[in-house]
């Protein structure tokens, strides 16, 4: 994209917000040129990246999907034979498998999408990051084609729904870019509009009044765009941003689980690994290896679209992994503010309102911080009256703003005098396992060499029975296991009485120490002499050894709460009411209508949604574990645990490895049969709702992927470890470090994270998705 000859060429790929603004001021680019450039990249790289897995591997008829970037999607006709993915398929005796197939969508029966089993296509050259582009004629199914005719081109066709007359007056991304150029030229007020010309994608659950918004779901709304923007989208519009696209995501923010009930799937999927997938938008692929998962969380397309330069920045949502996982897998920066400094559930489809929160993806932490500042309303601040979780203490929001703290250099000694606690629990793994070894080895070296060696921070490590202590590092006086022993008896004694899936006590040493006691209705355990309350006193005072598995990983499991039933009903009610206030009718306004007018890529979700529809009580079964209560208690406990570790070790912040596992193969075997490859320890920050900042930390070129094995009874496929290495072309597969501290200490976190980013410079753009031919630089007007 070029404006003037010679050294003044502006390269849009990998550009920062400041570099974009300088190029606009210099006349080296325009907003319209930037949007056109991104559209060209979308057309080149945003196609289908997955292939169907069919029973016989036979080709399927050619099929087309919805229009994106002015051309319809085209699906591959070649399929993968299921027996090439699943060993001993001829001996399988379990429930019927849901093989891959093409079907019309519910939203638009004239277009098709992939359903059932898929795998990533090797060297696809495509990633499928964006589901909807804000381009006139394709940004809505309700008002598609000529029903979105520009007002200057005359009246709409007679068959157009009445709401389309209202809708077509919203400028699309090209219109808005041209409007910004004509109004402000080379001299916009960047203080009043700090996001001027910055092109954003949004995880689909964020409501955008000028684009289809369905949470990624294939649901046939009367009006598939909402009547109002999400409050964060509204703020970005006001600050000059270009609302460009809705990103592919795991629909309904990770599908929300199954509350149980009478509805069962007719067919099952042997794995959903790498299915960060939308029935409407399809499945994304990793830009460093398109056979692999684009994320370990549902905001896949948000980070992916940033990583391959389809947009400059994106807003995602995290329940328990949905922003950090995508940032990790795509080597981009993330700031995930504490729950809930930034609103989410007030104008979005969530999954678990007690954990859902908004996060910011960009290629640098400095840009993330600039965006965080821009999201603040000059009067209301970050408060959203539609989201009760934004009632956070005012002292937890920095009065100085955030971008000013994200400017640390990577010079030697920048972090001298600061103390960082290493969460070794994030790096431990079973003895003899190979799958974690490459990333853990690299991350251990990165922390020690860069954070400690170059930047000068004092490193203090926690302990774990599976971790061999580093003799060069200080050991925590009180670590996470010690803090849990002191705090569980006070803040969440219920944990000690928890039963596992086998119906037996999770904490066996506790059961062995106490007298026979009812752990749950009709479930009595205990073979010792202590009263449970006296055991709690002894545990808190250090008079008895804690259970060997009382650790960060074991305590994260929670009962599924019934709040998804509440939240979706509330969202649909509000959306219909907003349209009624505008004089239009939306009849998809409750659970029965949603289920009657939806399709799902997996039949397990169809059954789950029908079960959700029949949930009638906000409480879980009386006498059993209560999901809402557990979320509130666990948040309090985990925040106190972090603070005890920080205070008793005089730490400034904590650092952890996001995950020791590389991006998994799409449709492949899980690690240790852990669904979605979510390590329990990694859930601590989300369950606590604490601010976390993620920075790319490097790449590995050797991985050990688990493989499928048929269970002994031949009724299901399970994971088996592999010691066979797979070589990945340079630069390899990414991994990231995560920095964490309490609310109100984001200034410290940003200093540490920006210093590390500046010193390490680990991000490498995905090589396959570089500048387009004849577009090595970004054109001005």
Feature-to-residue mapping (PLM):
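Loop/turn elements at helix/coil->beta-strand transitions in domains of secreted/extracellular proteins
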Residues: 17, 30-32, 190-191, 196-198, ...
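Short, surface-exposed loop/helix-turn segments at secondary-structure junctions
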Residues: 263, 627, 663-679, 705-719
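Short helix-loop capping/hinge segments that flank enzyme active sites or metal/cofactor-binding pockets
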Residues: 3-8, 124-127, 133-159, 195-218, ...
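Structural helix-boundary/capping segments
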Residues: 25, 35, 44, 307-434, ...
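Short, well-ordered alpha-helical
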Residues: 2-222, 249-255, 386-397, 406, ...
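Acidic-enriched catalytic cores of C-N bond-cleaving enzymes acting on peptides and small amides
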Residues: 39, 43, 50, 63-113, ...
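Second-shell loop/turn segments in exported
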Residues: 6-7, 19-26, 158-168, 219-223, ...
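Short glycine/serine-rich loop/turn segments
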Residues: 120-160, 192-356, 385-391, 423-425, ...
């Amino acid at each position: 994209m070029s404006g003037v000859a010679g050294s003044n060429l502006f390269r849009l790929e990998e550009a920062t917000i400041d570099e974009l603004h300088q190029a606009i001021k210099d006349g080296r680019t325009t907003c319209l040129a930037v949007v056109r450039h991104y559209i060209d990249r979308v057309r080149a790289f945003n196609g289908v990246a997955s292939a169907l897995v069919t029973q016989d591997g036979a080709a399927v008829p050619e099929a087309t999907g919805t229009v994106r970037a002015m051309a319809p999607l085209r699906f591959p006709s070649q399929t993968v034979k299921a027996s090439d993915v699943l060993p001993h398929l001829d001996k399988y005796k379990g429930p019927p498998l849901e093989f891959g197939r093409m079907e019309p969508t519910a939203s638009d029966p004239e277009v098709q999408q992939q359903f059932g089993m898929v795998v990533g296509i090797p060297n696809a050259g495509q990633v499928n990051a964006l589901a909807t582009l804000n381009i006139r004629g394709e940004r809505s199914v309700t008002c598609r084609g000529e029903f979105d005719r520009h007002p200057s081109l005359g009246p709409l066709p007679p068959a157009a729904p009445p709401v389309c007359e209202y809708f077509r007056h919203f400028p699309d991304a090209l219109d808005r870019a041209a409007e910004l150029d004509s109004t402000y030229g080379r001299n916009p007020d960047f203080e009043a509009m700090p996001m001027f010309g910055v092109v954003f994608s949004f995880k689909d659950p964020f409501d955008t009044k000028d684009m289809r918004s369905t949470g990624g779901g294939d649901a046939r709304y009367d009006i598939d765009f909402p009547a109002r923007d999400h409050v964060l989208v509204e703020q970005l519009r006001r600050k000059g941003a270009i609302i460009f696209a809705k990103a592919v995501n795991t629909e309904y923010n990770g599908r929300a689980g199954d509350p149980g009930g009478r509805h069962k799937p007719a067919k099952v999927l042997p794995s959903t690994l790498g299915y960060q997938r939308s029935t409407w938008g399809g499945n994304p692929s990793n830009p460093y290896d398109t056979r692999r998962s684009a994320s370990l969380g549902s905001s896949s397309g948000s980070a992916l679209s940033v990583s391959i330069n389809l947009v400059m920045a994106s807003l995602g949502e995290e329940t328990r992994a949905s922003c950090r996982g995508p940032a990790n897998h795509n080597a981009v920066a993330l700031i995930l503010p504490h729950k809930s400094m930034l609103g989410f559930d007030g104008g979005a489809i969530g999954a678990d309102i007690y954990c859902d929160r908004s996060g910011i993806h960009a290629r640098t932490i400095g840009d993330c911080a600039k965006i965080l500042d821009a999201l603040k309303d000059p009067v209301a601040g970050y408060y959203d009256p539609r989201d009760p979780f934004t009632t956070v203490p005012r002292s937890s929001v920095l009065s100085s703003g955030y971008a000013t703290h994200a400017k640390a250099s990577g010079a030697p000694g920048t972090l001298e005098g600061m103390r960082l606690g290493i969460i070794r629990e994030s790096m431990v793994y079973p003895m003899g396992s190979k799958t974690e070894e490459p990333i853990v080895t690299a991350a251990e070296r990165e922390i020690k060499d860069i954070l400690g060696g170059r930047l000068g921070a004092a490193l203090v490590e926690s302990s774990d029975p599976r971790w061999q202590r580093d003799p060069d590092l200080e050991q925590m006086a009180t670590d996470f296991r010690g803090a849990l022993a002191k705090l569980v008896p006070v803040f969440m004694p219920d944990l000690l009485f928890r039963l596992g899936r086998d119906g037996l006590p999770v904490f066996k040493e506790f059961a062995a120490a106490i007298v026979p006691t009812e752990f749950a209705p009709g479930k009595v355990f205990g073979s010792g002499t202590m009263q449970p309350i006296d055991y709690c006193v002894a545990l808190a005072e250090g008079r008895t050894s804690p259970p060997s598995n009382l650790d960060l990983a074991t305590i994260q499991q929670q009962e599924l709460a019934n709040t998804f039933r509440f939240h979706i009903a509330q969202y649909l009610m509000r959306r219909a009411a907003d349209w009624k206030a505008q004089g239009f009718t939306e009849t998809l306004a409750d659970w029965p209508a949603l289920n009657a007018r939806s399709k799902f890529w997996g039949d397990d979700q169809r059954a789950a949604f029908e079960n959700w529809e029949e949930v009638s009580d906000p409480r879980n079964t009386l006498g059993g574990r209560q999901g809402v209560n557990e979320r509130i208690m666990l948040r309090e406990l985990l925040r106190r645990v972090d603070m005890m570790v920080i205070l008793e070790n005089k730490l400034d912040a904590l650092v952890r490895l996001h995950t020791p596992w590389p991006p998994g193969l799409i449709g492949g075997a899980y690690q240790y049969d852990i669904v979605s490859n979510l390590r329990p320890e990694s859930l601590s920050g989300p369950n606590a709702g604490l601010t976390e900042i993620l920075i790319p930390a490097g790449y590995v070129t050797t991985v050990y992927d688990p493989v499928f094995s048929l269970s002994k009874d031949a009724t299901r496929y399970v994971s088996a470890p592999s010691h066979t290495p797979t070589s990945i072309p340079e630069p390899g597969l990414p991994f990231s470090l995560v920095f964490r501290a309490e609310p109100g200490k984001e200034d410290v976190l940003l200093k540490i994270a920006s210093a590390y980013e500046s010193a390490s410079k680990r991000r490498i753009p995905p090589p396959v998705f570089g500048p387009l031919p004849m577009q090595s630089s970004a054109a001005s007007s």
